[in-house]
Amino acid sequence: MTPLSSELVGFTIPFYSKTQKPYSNSSHGLLLSHNRSSLLTFSNSNPNNDNGRSFSSSGARNLQTTTTTDATLPTERRQQHSQSLGFRDTQMLKIFHRSCRSGNYIESLHLLETMVRKGYNPDVILCTKLIKGFFTLRNIPKAVRVMEILEKFGQPDVFAYNALINGFCKMNRIDDATRVLDRMRSKDFSPDTVTYNIMIGSLCSRGKLDLALKVLNQLLSDNCQPTVITYTILIEATMLEGGVDEALKLMDEMLSRGLKPDMFTYNTIIRGMCKEGMVDRAFEMVRNLELKGCEPDVISYNILLRALLNQGKWEEGEKLMTKMFSEKCDPNVVTYSILITTLCRDGKIEEAMNLLKLMKEKGLTPDAYSYDPLIAAFCREGRLDVAIEFLETMISDGCLPDIVNYNTVLATLCKNGKADQALEIFGKLGEVGCSPNSSSYNTMFSALWSSGDKIRALHMILEMMSNGIDPDEITYNSMISCLCREGMVDEAFELLVDMRSCEFHPSVVTYNIVLLGFCKAHRIEDAINVLESMVGNGCRPNETTYTVLIEGIGFAGYRAEAMELANDLVRIDAISEYSFKRLHRTFPLLNVLQRSSQTFGY
């Protein structure tokens, strides 16, 4: 084994174990079975995780069934003890307050448990803060533990339940949030509008509009009044699905309930119309607003301006700007950024620079979004020195570049073979308070690998994971390609399996890379298994897939099978004339040539 292969073997195991989801049930065992203990260790490595009570799918059910055993004093004695000592005046309560304020939630919970053992009644406000704190730490069992104590020894209110529901929703545990909602009702607590808005907002943000509308119906059946926020959330979600007419129906329903849409609601609809290409209809809505005495704001104008300029309608955009000034609606940073972006897109860099200068003269401070199109434009023109100088100008102007600005420069440097200069900038990202993201690491990995520095490239991926940055699809594709080039197809295939377990969808290019790797190794059965897996996972093979497989079968010594497959593919027009000629040059397929002579005019 070469030093590089040895390094790769040592690399792929920790890569796989760190990226593998703990709930994966993949049966591809080479690395998974080897690293099961590593996976378990990694999944439990968060110091804020609770290693006690399991709260998988039954977390909210535990809330319903758990009997707290920490407070063993009889009820009468607890009440007498609480009354005699004066709960709010105790030194322990002061410490509890202090630990909650400082964010030391583990210590706070310990104090809470100690206090209830002594007969003190838990304070609902502090417990609510504690619930929110544990959800911030992603420590669900501890958050549920606080609610258990509050229910058994205190008096929870709707705010405490809302905190629990909101925490579950933010962690995408909608079923648990629903169970808490049901529990509220069982304890004679009436969910308020905030409760329902939390549920509706969470469902909408996850694309579950149908369920969100059902929650709205439940809200109405509970005699709870929806608010402007309720309908605006639903309207925005409806617009994201392209349902302009449905969104307008929701607004009509909103008006029929005596609710007056605000500009945020109207802007949501205007934005949705513009995204669907209904710019004229969006302008009509703005005109109707003006007739109703509702003035569009700068956000409204920015939405319309972006839509017009994206269609190349500069003249209409200028008219809109004139109207904006006449209505005494001053352009903001976003307005100028839209104009700068469009000018750069159209190659008018000098005009964009002048606009940036005008923006500063107007007393506006450009942000990273204002500079980014200019940096990208300079990079496209190969003016790297100017782009890098712009980064320094941003810092001197008090605008810290974001990672998008830096990634643009890094990618251009690497593309131009200046990996060392890119590495120098990459190494200073932490010093300027801008942490690299997966795109930064992917760029550097590809550049280092292409330059021949493969070991350093692999260490870049390890550094990425050690910094808590999850690999993305580009990371996987790059790694799979590199491993296949080194002949390590089994490890590449394991990453392909891991990729799917992480809910990524390998593209046809990714499958073709692994397929080619197996074919080059003359492992045709494994190549066919990859093809079957590809089709089974809903990824349609392309012409490259078929030609790679035919060549692989032929070079492995199975000429007859290769010719048979080629015949079948020619018959169904899955292979073009160009690909057929290339195959024929590689090794003569006489039978195929005879049968397809009429097809390709031989």
Curated annotation (Swiss-Prot):
Biased composition (Low complexity): 65-74
Cellular-component GO terms for this entry: chloroplast
Segments of skewed composition (Polar residues): 42-64
Region (Disordered): 42-85
Residues of the transit peptide: 1-78
Pfam family, one: PPR_2
Ranges of the PPR repeats in the UniProt entry: 88-122, 123-153, 157-191, 192-226, 227-261, 262-296, 297-331, 332-366, 367-401, 402-436, 437-471, 472-506, 507-541, 542-576
Keyword Transit peptide: yes
Keywords associated with the record: Chloroplast, Plastid, Repeat, Transit peptide
Cellular localisation: Plastid, Chloroplast
GO molecular function, one term: mRNA binding
InterPro entries (UniProt xref): Pentatricopeptide_rpt (IPR002885), TPR-like_helical_dom_sf (IPR011990)
Family: Belongs to the PPR family. P subfamily.
Protein name as it appears in the record: Pentatricopeptide repeat-containing protein At3g04760, chloroplastic
Species: Arabidopsis thaliana
Source organism phylogeny: Eukaryota, Viridiplantae, Streptophyta, Embryophyta, Tracheophyta
